[in-house]
A protein has these predicted regions:
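Active-site segments that bind and position negatively charged phosphate/pyrophosphate groups
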Residues: 217-255
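Catalytic nucleophile loop
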Residues: 118
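Short, glycine- and charge-enriched coil/turn segments that flank and shape catalytic ligand pockets
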Residues: 41-44, 68-74, 212-227, 242
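Acidic-aromatic/histidine active-site loop/patch
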Residues: 115
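A glycine/threonine-rich phosphate-anchoring loop and its flanking beta-alpha core
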Residues: 17, 123-216
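Amphipathic, well-packed alpha-helical segments that form the structural scaffold of globular domains
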Residues: 95, 193, 211, 233-237
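ATP/NTP phosphate-donor binding region
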Residues: 3-108
Length: 255
């Protein structure tokens, strides 16, 4: 794979059966989000932004204000942050919110947050009225390079992680890499684990670049983050296109 270029806006298109399914758009702010969502013909549709209590404080108002002129109605559903809330009880509360606000099959959900938000929102979208459209607005490194891409959704059941789930492709993945500047160090490290795995397993040139630019990446310099996320998006796209349900894509270490 050739190295990706450093650009302020990058677009990666995911294909299935050689047909374009959705775009992964990466920018440095949210200003291009209205233009991207307008391409989904949402002007006469309701939109529910799903997020958690941490991301709500940082980005919900900004995103809601940007998208309000693009949609018939914009509402939000906020649940307590944490894996322990990624369960059917929270999904039930989201269903109730959608029903009370008269959401139908023509309406849309948007996941604003990390993997927990994306998994839960995607699962709700896959199952509400037998499936409604949704988009991903990932705000953590792990979700930007992995979990927001590919359509895997699900929630935990009792002590069992991701026991209840479905495959449901997003209509758009919109990444603002500047959200990584507010990410706690432990969550940034978790995302870097996936990034390094991409290089080790899929692209030696990428792994070498990661080693050479480690200081800039860990310092969260925008150019380094932009290239990291874009390169990982290209790798993830190739995996999803080859194996949409990722049934045969398994990483083996030390075996």
């Amino acid at each position: 794979m050739t190295e990706v270029k450093n650009e302020k806006m990058n677009r990666v298109t995911v294909h299935l059966d050689e047909k374009p399914i959705y775009d992964i758009v990466m920018t440095e702010d949210f200003s291009a989000l209205p233009g991207e969502i307008e391409k989904l013909s949402i002007s006469n549709r309701r939109l529910c932004i799903v997020t958690d209590s941490n991301v709500e404080k940082l980005y919900l108002n900004e995103v809601k204000e940007l998208l309000a002129p693009c949609c018939k109605t914009v509402i939000s559903f906020v649940f307590p942050a944490g894996e322990e809330h990624k369960n059917l009880d929270t999904v039930r509360d989201l269903y109730e919110t959608l029903i009370l606000n008269h959401f139908d099959r023509n309406d849309m959900l948007a996941a604003l947050g990390g993997g927990v938000v994306g998994d839960l929102c995607g699962f709700a979208a896959a199952t509400y009225l037998r499936g409604v459209a949704f988009m991903q607005i990932p705000t953590t490194l792990l979700s930007q390079v992995d979990s927001s891409i590919g359509g895997k959704t699900g929630v935990d059941f009792d002590a069992y992680k991701n026991m209840v789930g479905a495959f449901h492709m997003p209509k758009l993945v919109f990444t603002n890499i500047n959200t990584l500047q507010t990410l706690p160090d432990n969550q940034f490290s978790a995302g870097m684990g996936e990034v390094i795995k991409h290089g080790l397993i899929k692209d030696a040139a990428y792994y070498e670049w990661l080693l050479e630019n480690a200081a800039d990446i860990w310092a969260r310099k925008p150019d380094a983050l932009r290239k990291t996320v874009t390169w990982s998006n290209e790798i993830k796209r190739a995996v999803v296109e080859k194996d949409p349900t990722e049934e045969h894509t398994v990483a083996f270490f030390g075996r």
